Amino acid sequence: MQHLAVASDMTQTLFLGLALFAVLLWIFTQHCNIAVGLLLGVQVWAIAAGGETPFLDVGFSLLPSDLLAACAVLVAGARLLRRGAPPRAELLLLLAVVCLIAWSIQRGTGTFGLTSAANDARVYFWQFFASALYVATAPLHAGRARVVVRLWLVSAAAYAALSLAGWVNTGLHSVVDAATVGGQVYDPRPVPARSALVLAQSAVLLLCPWGGKGGNSSASARPVEHGPGGDRGRREGRTTDGGRRKVLPALLCLVLVVLLQHRTVWAIVIVMAVVGWAMVPARAGQRLACAAAALFSSCVVTLVFAAGMFGRVGSVLAGSFLETQDENSTFAWRVLGWQELLKGPKTLVEWLLGSPFGSGYDRWVGGVVISVSPHDFYLHVLLRLGVVGLLTLLALYLLLWRRLGGVGNGTPALRLVVVSHLVLFVSYSPFPEQGVLLGLCLWQLRADAADRSGGGPRKPLVDRSMMKRQEWTGIRKTVNTGMERDQPREWDDDSPSSRPSRRPALRP
């Protein structure tokens, strides 16, 4: 009887899981924006709850993010098969990486078992590239990029709230301070580096203009054209005021990034700032003015910091910065681990195609066996996908950087996102939510190409609500014109005070 009860519970759980999967698959198919919100929301929930709770055992513990990634891959594959047209070069590179990942998982399952292979590939490969592929193949509808950016900013606001709540609970401490609560050592930073990176990228999305060189941006980013008789100056003024309103939340995001003390994210912000400055047009001294303003701000901050006006916050940040120069710093620990991983025996096939997922990352660092991932995505890809996978990944990002900077589709914010990923990969493997931004870069290139082509996309980049408003406006104009045509012209056309009557003339 006990075995029957267990079997009944497993059957019910399986049916519930299949029903949930069917609902999610319908959402991913019919409601792309909601699906992107789920991909971002599950990561916020995982950080707020301290991790995801498995809800099904299928040979390995199935997490909610795994289920969402499976839906994303299935729907993206169906889109590619239904479209029938050959995808663009950058999308082909992404598909090549996904195929290499699937093949490595299959090899790892046969050698080390499904659990080991799935746990090795699930976060930094499966979930990351699944999100990227889903967003990259999303239908070309007007406002898609704007919705994705807004969802990204909502997740950043959630991380900001979690950071503030953590500081209220435990206070602000330096990374070098080993704090304990209830006898357990905890990280003094309230949220991990992935959350700080989302905040930094949100500042970029808020501050950078969304559009291409020469003003020929995609329809999703094209400003509304001014109709005849419209107040263009007033509308441009509203746009300028909206840009100014974005400065304050962007600065708040950057302040939180500094206080969170994730030094890798600090480096990412610095590199993005330098690259962003290099992309500023050199005409009219704009680049020189930006450099002068940045130098002046840096000098002021340095003087205030040296004078001790930041108080305890300044000492906390100074301790975190000095830790990077110590011989026992976390970066030095990572470098030692990288060297040990590269010393392992490798055959020619392993160098070219990598070892299968589940092989492990055991290495000796400081007399201790370390088994966590390499903390370097370039090395991570080399170990699992080989030189072929690493070159494919680099080609994908270099092609994105080049094409996002071309005439007609240059998007400074997305180019800086590409830069942030390339710097992040030095110290971390990519987090699942970063796949949404990678997919957005690919989607934006598709949208720009559709705008430039004569035939346009299969689904036009036109807001349907705007089309309906234009249709109703045309109907009203037609009705009014017909009524005026039937009215007798009895008013004085030369009199400025005369107005036509909207009421039809009464017949005697």
Say what each PLM segment does:
Residues 321-385, 404:
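Long extracytoplasmic/lumenal interhelical loops at the membrane interface
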Residues 1-80, 101-107, 421:
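N-terminal signal-anchor transmembrane segment
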Residues 32-39, 85-100, 134-164, 223:
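Interfacial loop-to-transmembrane-helix boundary motif in multi-pass membrane proteins
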Residues 277-325, 344-347, 506-507:
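A membrane-periplasm/extracellular boundary helix in multi-pass inner-membrane enzymes
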Residues 223-228, 236, 383-421, 447-448, ...:
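Hydrophobic transmembrane alpha-helices and their immediate junctions
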Residues 62-72, 90-105, 113-137, 147:
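Aromatic-anchored transmembrane helix interface
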Residues 204-205, 413-425, 430-471, 477-480, ...:
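Transmembrane alpha-helices of multi-pass inner-membrane enzymes
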Residues 23, 130-131, 146-174, 188-280:
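Alpha-helical transmembrane segments of multi-pass inner-membrane proteins
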